[in-house]
Every structure is written in C-alpha cells, then in structure tokens.
C-alpha cells in the first residue's frame, strides 16, 4: 500500500514447510565432543509467518534518506529442536513438544552524504524462544540484538568500492555447561 510517493507499507503472511537436515545444518556441534542423539521419526518443520514493513524516503538537503522498519513473527507448529541444555555431554535432536516462536524487529537508515559515499545504519532486536523438555527458554547462541554501521565509498568510475563496517552483537543465552547434582554447584 502506497499512501504517497514517499511511504510504502507491506504486509505478508504465509505458511512454510521445511525439511531439516540436522547434521548438515549443525555440523559445528560435531567438534564439541558431545554425544549426538537423533530421535527417530523427525517431522518436517511447519510454521506460520507474519510480517509488516514500512519504507519511507525523506528528502534531506537535495538527497534521499531511506528509512525501513520491519517486524516479522514466526510461530512454529512443528520444529526439530536442537537441545544442548538437557545434558551437557550430549546434543539431542527431537520434535517440538510445546511452543516455539520468533519475533524480529529491524530498523535501517541509509543516506548518501556526497557522491560515492553512503552511510548505512541498522539495528535488529530478536526474541526467539523454544520449549525444551517442557520448559520454554530463549534459543541458545542467538543474539538478542545486533547493530551495524557501514560507511561505503565508490570511486567516480565505479571500478573500486571501499567499505568500513562496525558491528555490535548483543549477548545471548549459552547452554548450561555443567550438571547440577542435588541442586548444588
């Protein structure tokens, strides 16, 4: 939907299916010395996806400032869970028994300060949670937030381009690396 030439709204919704290839997609876990347990009869993943975005173009000093904001929500009906928390000596793959979802909000701005030089900034906030053996927790190894700032310069003939990128990664949950014996550390 375009109410005028400077603002564009988009909505999307759909259902997706995906076959999970547990070893190919999680091969980094093979170097962790954990025993790999793969449940029999893993289901094809199934999820509903919803999204909304707005793009706006603001004239500033004869140039165009582009601002984009988007929000996406994914609700998993079926998912292969990668469980690194139940046992610190193994990684288990099994079908979701509970709820799993992801909320992602991102905003981005880009402005060409002078011919060939563009500055772009972006920020993303993520809330991804999954049920592990009856307990809903934040997905491990997933950053809660991420910031990005890129300065880009392209030479007048367009042959060379130079970029400097600064990145900020927010903390995320780490799997528990030890077992609790009788609630003691």
Which residues does each predicted region cover?
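Residue-level signature of outer-membrane beta-barrel architecture
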Residues: 1-3, 15, 44, 56-58, ...
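Membrane-embedded beta-barrel scaffold of Gram-negative outer-membrane proteins
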Residues: 2, 8-10, 43-95, 101
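Short, intrinsically disordered, charge-balanced linker/junction segments flanking boundaries
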Residues: 1, 5, 164, 179-185
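Gram-negative outer-membrane beta-barrel transporters
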Residues: 66-77, 93-178
């Amino acid at each position: 939907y375009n109410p005028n030439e400077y603002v564009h709204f988009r909505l999307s919704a759909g259902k997706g299916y995906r076959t999970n290839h547990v070893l190919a997609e999680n091969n980094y876990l093979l170097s962790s010395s954990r025993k790999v347990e793969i449940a029999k009869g893993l289901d094809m993943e199934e999820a509903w996806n919803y999204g909304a975005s707005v793009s706006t173009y603001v004239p500033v000093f004869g140039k165009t400032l582009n601002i984009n904001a988007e929000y996406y929500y994914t609700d998993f009906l079926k998912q292969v869970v990668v469980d690194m928390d139940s046992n610190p000596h193994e990684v288990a793959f099994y079908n979701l028994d509970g709820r799993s979802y992801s909320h992602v909000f991102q905003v981005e701005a880009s402005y060409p300060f002078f011919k060939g030089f563009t500055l772009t900034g972006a920020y993303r906030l993520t809330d991804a949670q999954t049920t592990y053996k009856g307990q809903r927790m934040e997905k491990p190894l997933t950053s809660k937030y991420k910031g990005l700032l890129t300065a880009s310069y392209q030479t007048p003939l367009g042959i060379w381009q130079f970029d400097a990128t600064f990145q900020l990664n927010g903390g995320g949950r780490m799997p528990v690396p030890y077992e609790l014996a009788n609630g003691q550390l």
